[in-house]
Amino acid sequence: MDLKQELATKGYAIVPNVISTEQVEIAKKLFREWQATIPDHDNVHAKVDPHGIYKYHHAGHTKHAWYLRTLPAVQAVYKKLWDCDKLITSFDGCCYIPKSLTKKDNCWTHTDQAPSSKGVKCYQGFIALTANKERTLVVYEGSHTLHERYFADRGNTSNKNWCKIDPAFLDTIKDTKRALDVPAGSLVLWESRTFHQNHYGKPNSEERMIQYICMLPDNHPKNTESMKRKRVKYFNDRRTTSHWPCPINVNGEQPQTYGDKSRLIDYSKVVKYDFPDVQMQEAIMKLL
């Protein structure tokens, strides 16, 4: 089964060996170096990054993120999917779950495509820097084909691109639930209608380290001149975004405080990476 057919049938796919063992180690080293720049990282990460997902601290513009986005082998998968020669990227964050974590899972299974949006619009993805089968992505196989009916039955016509799925409904399709066994170096893809969530798995089981990567064709109808200017601005400002390259939407720079000001991030202490290497600069600019 080819990749497009697998995505059309199952709603997800694991593409193994997209990056080499050496490239995995380079990215992991850069990832850990970035983590070390965040004061009191472990406590801060546990407190402000939901489900282990980095949304703050310029997480969309780390060295490891741009290293992986600009690798030809990663781009080649997206170019083949979209049958194009030129791509644009989101500035999505990354995810880290330490082996020592003992939190239990709750249900926040969701779809990232609005109820009002029909058909294939986007393929989300991540590069796995660790091998995982416990702390991993959970998907409901074939759920992308249920997206339209699910929301129609509930009279939901929202244009919001994040919608939680009713746990009672998920129980009716529990036989399609898959906790993915993901080798390091893989690119995991899923169609944005697919019902999915992160999964902690067993306590003290595995370290999980991934970089989210999502790309669309440069000639996408929503990639207007205004949108291109906005993406360049968000790059220059080092803003982290949702997974959609267009229309591009930034995350807030501060987490919810819930009255606790210690959760606020002091951006004067956050490293804002520059990319002085000319080849890297050129590779980045091609994706904006």
PLM regions: where:
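Short, conserved beta-strand element in jelly-roll/cupin
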Residues: 116-133, 181-184, 189, 214-217
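Double-stranded beta-helix
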Residues: 132-197
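Short edge-strand/loop segments of extracellular domains
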Residues: 99, 142-147, 214-220
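Short, surface-exposed loop/helix-turn segments at secondary-structure junctions
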Residues: 105-112, 161-174, 209, 226-232
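Non-heme Fe(II)-dependent double-stranded beta-helix
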Residues: 2-9, 16-116
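Secondary-structure boundary elements
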Residues: 79-88, 117-119, 128-136, 146
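Non-heme Fe(II)/2-oxoglutarate
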Residues: 37, 189, 194-288
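A short beta-loop-beta micro-motif enriched in histidine and acidic residues
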Residues: 109-122, 175-176, 182, 206-207
